[in-house]
C-alpha cells in the first residue's frame, strides 16, 4: 500500500509457500473497503492458465465479498465479460487470453494490475510481455519467487512493466549494468542495481519467517485398494 500511495510499482518475491496470493487478496480487499463510493477500484489479475481458477477459489474462500470474475468462454463471451466489468470488480485472466483479448481491454482503466508468476514476461520482446504492458493501470504489482532465473534482462523486463524507464532503456541498462556486472564481474554495477531496486522488492525466505509460521500438522490417511487394484498372488 505504501508503494501504491507513492505511485510506485513493486515485486512480491516471497519464497513459495509464504502466501503471496493471500497477501494480494488482502490488499485488494482493503482497497475496495477503503475507497470512496464511485471511486474506480477495478483490478486485473493475470496468471498462468493453470492458476486462473485457483485465484478464484482463493478469493471465494478468503474474501467472499470481493466481486471477482474469471474471463473465460469463447471470444464473444470473453469480450462481454471484459466490456461489462464494473469499477469495483476483479477480473482474472491468463497470459494467453490477455494476448488474444487485448483490444477488448483498450477502453478500460484499472486501479490495480497484478501479474502472477511474473517470469512469464522475462523476455521483453515476446507478445505476452508487450501485452501486459499495454494495459492502462494506476498501480502494478508482480509476483514471482524467482525475479531472475538466468539473465538480468529478466529483471529489467519486470521493472519495465512496473515502472517503465526506471531501469533506463534496455540498451542503456545492458551497457551500464548488465554487461559490466555479468561479463566483467563489476561489483559496482551490481551494487548500483541492488541499491536501485531494493525499495521495490519484498523477498522473504521460509527460514526468515520460520518462527512466525504455525506448526506443521501431519495426518496419515489410509485408503484401501479397490478390487480391481488389489490382486492376490
Model-derived segments and spans:
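ASCE P-loop NTPase motor core, strongest for the SF2 helicase catalytic module
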Residues: 1-185, 192-233
Amino acid at each position: 500500500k505504501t508503494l501504491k500511495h507513492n505511485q510506485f510499482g513493486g515485486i512480491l518475491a516471497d519464497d513459495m509457500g509464504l502466501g503471496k496470493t493471500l497477501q494480494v487478496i488482502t490488499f485488494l480487499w482493503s482497497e475496495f473497503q477503503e475507497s470512496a463510493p464511485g471511486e474506480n477500484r477495478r483490478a486485473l489479475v493475470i496468471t498462468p492458465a493453470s492458476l486462473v481458477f485457483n485465484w478464484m477459489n482463493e478469493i471465494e474462500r478468503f474474501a467472499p465479498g470481493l466481486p471477482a470474475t474469471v474471463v473465460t468462454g469463447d471470444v464473444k463471451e470473453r469480450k462481454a465479460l471484459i466490456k461489462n466489468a464494473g469499477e469495483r470488480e476483479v477480473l482474472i485472466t491468463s497470459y494467453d487470453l490477455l494476448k488474444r483479448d487485448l483490444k477488448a481491454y483498450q477502453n478500460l482503466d484499472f486501479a490495480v494490475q497484478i501479474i502472477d508468476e511474473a517470469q512469464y514476461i522475462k523476455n521483453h520482446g515476446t507478445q505476452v510481455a508487450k501485452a501486459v504492458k499495454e494495459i492502462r493501470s494506476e498501480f502494478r504489482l508482480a509476483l514471482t519467487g524467482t525475479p531472475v532465473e538466468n539473465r538480468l534482462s529478466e529483471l529489467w523486463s519486470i521493472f519495465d512493466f512496473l515502472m517503465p524507464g526506471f531501469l533506463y532503456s534496455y540498451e542503456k541498462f545492458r551497457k551500464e549494468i548488465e554487461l559490466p556486472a555479468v561479463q566483467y564481474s563489476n561489483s559496482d554495477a551490481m551494487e548500483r542495481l541492488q541499491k536501485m531496486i531494493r525499495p521495490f522488492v519484498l523477498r522473504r525466505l521460509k527460514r526468515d519467517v520460520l518462527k512466525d509460521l504455525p506448526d506443521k500438522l501431519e495426518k496419515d490417511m489410509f485408503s484401501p485398494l479397490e478390487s480391481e487394484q488389489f490382486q492376490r498372488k
